[in-house]
Amino acid sequence: MELKKVWAVYFSGTGTTRSTVERIAHVIAGKLDLPVERVDFSVPTVRQREQRFNAADLVVFGTQVIAGRVPNVLLPYLREKIIGGGALVVPVVLFGNRNYDDALVELRNILAADGLHPVAAGAFVGEHSFSRVLGQGRPNEADKALMDEFAAKIARQVRALPAAPEKPVPVRGEDPIRPYYTPRDSAGNPINILKVKPRTEMTRCDGCGLFAEICDMGSINPAD
């Protein structure tokens, strides 16, 4: 196959998925001597636009894991706005050191339905977005070395491909996809984490509006 571009495409609430996807994409691009283009769809305004690829593209496509699955807020964008055009794709998920459950197979299936060809896939541990204790310091240097090795293998694999594969790469997970994981307390009782809300320390807020601008849910009203 003759590839002309590598894409780094991601949803990244705290930056860990971004750094992982960009690292993998740049290693692949370096091995294949190709340029890299980046699409960050973390904010809602970007998710309103179509994103088109073609058969000369290799796309490293990543998202964080929420409750063992692809975040449900992303599903309309992923299913309706991504136009695969026969591109090769590498689904990547980042999870906060519990489990990625069905997130990887779910992302793979969605991207395949969009007209992309999954040739490899990976799940990596990242520091949990709710805590600096869960998955603390991840991805660490050992994780990054695995990312580099993963990317180098992908470069070798796609260089040898005569054409896009008909079947998507096998990945761990159940299909049909299971329901979203339900968090539980130490006694095993279900917890509703939707009640968790951020609290602003008004004495430290200068009203710059940055958090409202970069909020991946678009849920912060700067006028509040």
Question: Where are each of the predicted segments found?
Answer:
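Ferredoxin-like iron-sulfur electron-transfer modules
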Residues: 168-172, 183-207, 212-224
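FMN-binding flavodoxin-like domain, especially the glycine-rich phosphate-binding loop
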Residues: 1-20, 24-43, 49-190
